Amino acid sequence: MKDNFNRNIDYLRISIIDRCNLRCIYCMPEEGITNLLPHHEILSYEEILKIVEIGVDLGITKIRITGGEPLLRKGIVSFIERLARIEGIRDIGMTTNGVLLKKFAKDLYNAGLKRVNVSLDSLDENKFRAITRVGLIDDVFEGIDEAKNAGLQPVKVNVVVMKGINDDEIEKFALWSKKVEYQIRFIEFMPVGQNAWKKELFISKDEIKERIENKIGKLIPVQMKKSGPAEYFMLAGAKGFLGFISPMTTHICVRCNRLRLTADGKLRPCLFSDKEVDIKKILRSGASTEEIRETIIKTIHLKPQGMSEHTKPLRPMSTIGG
């Protein structure tokens, strides 16, 4: 399915829960989400599967499960198993904070999950706690190791870089890539939802790369299959790779191929926009398959061309889906 700018839309990111067991400073307010969705307002697994099945008929081949923290939702393993049985789905990934990953990794792999992205913004225990406001970093390290051992590969580690908060660890993360077979991805700090975005916290992809090359060594470009918005490099002799995602300084919108489905049933054409379509309302009104199909097509045609059309969304990131 093509949007109005001839981009092929084949990727659906699904937030299955608005709750999280961390309180990351760029994702949700310090007090957490005070207006958590009641159970009946959240899409059921059956409703999600129906939307996915119709989406597959329109060309969706790739699914990513997000939250909140998706591993908090009951029945997640059996849901992944049902999702993996849908003919036409070629790839299922998950974005998680990793806290519960040790417990679930093997079962998720056996159910059909292909890979995981783990959010980890510090390698230091005290700083990790300051950024997440709660949480034990050892749980995340153990979860990452268990994911790799279970076969959920490649493991991608997402690092949101914030000046004066964790930018002093850029070199530590880069050196870590020499020892581990992970894809460590530096992400520019974005103004999304009700996060604590401040211009003075922003550090660009180019500055991050420059610091690595000045202090550690040359970044060797690497071509990755299905790399999405990330640009990949490696250090000489490294086991892992370094990725850079730069939504603020690079025109990544030109190759955007995704839609987002929120936990409360809103279909969103763009992370950086408040445009959304209430597909849950249509679904629960007894709409036909064709009506749901037309709703998905309508949402695809709402996708903006690029950043110039964006307004900062009012939802916290945890309710949109990372």
UniProtKB/Swiss-Prot annotation:
Q: Which cofactor does it need?
A: [4Fe-4S] cluster
List, alphabetically, the SMART domains matched.
Elp3 (SM00729)
What is any Pfam family matched here? Answer: Radical_SAM
Keywords, alphabetical: 4Fe-4S, GTP-binding, Iron, Iron-sulfur, Lyase, Metal-binding, Molybdenum cofactor biosynthesis, Nucleotide-binding, S-adenosyl-L-methionine
Work out whether the entry's keyword set contains 4Fe-4S: yes
Against PROSITE patterns, the record matches this protein to:
MOAA_NIFB_PQQE, RADICAL_SAM
Cofactor: bound how, per the entry note?
Answer: Binds 2 [4Fe-4S] clusters. Binds 1 [4Fe-4S] cluster coordinated with 3 cysteines and an exchangeable S-adenosyl-L-methionine and 1 [4Fe-4S] cluster coordinated with 3 cysteines and the GTP-derived substrate.
Q: What is its EC number?
A: 4.1.99.22
**UniProt binding sites for GTP:** R13, R64, T95, K156, R258, L259, R260
Q: What residue stretches are annotated with the Radical SAM core domain?
A: 4-229
InterPro entries linked to this entry: Aldolase_TIM, Elp3/MiaA/NifB-like_rSAM, MoaA, MoaA_NifB_PqqE_Fe-S-bd_CS, MoaA_twitch, MoCo_biosynth_MoaA/MoaC, rSAM
Quote the record's binding site residues for [4Fe-4S] cluster 1: C20, C24, C27
Q: Where are the transmembrane segments?
A: none
Q: Does the keyword Mitochondrion apply?
A: no
List positions binding S-adenosyl-L-methionine: Y26, G68, S119, M190
Q: Which family does it belong to?
A: Belongs to the radical SAM superfamily. MoaA family.
On assembly, the entry states: Monomer and homodimer.
* Function of the protein: Catalyzes the cyclization of GTP to (8S)-3',8-cyclo-7,8-dihydroguanosine 5'-triphosphate.
User: Which named protein is this?
Assistant: GTP 3',8-cyclase
Species, as recorded: Thermodesulfovibrio yellowstonii (strain ATCC 51303 / DSM 11347 / YP87)
Gene giving rise to this polypeptide = moaA
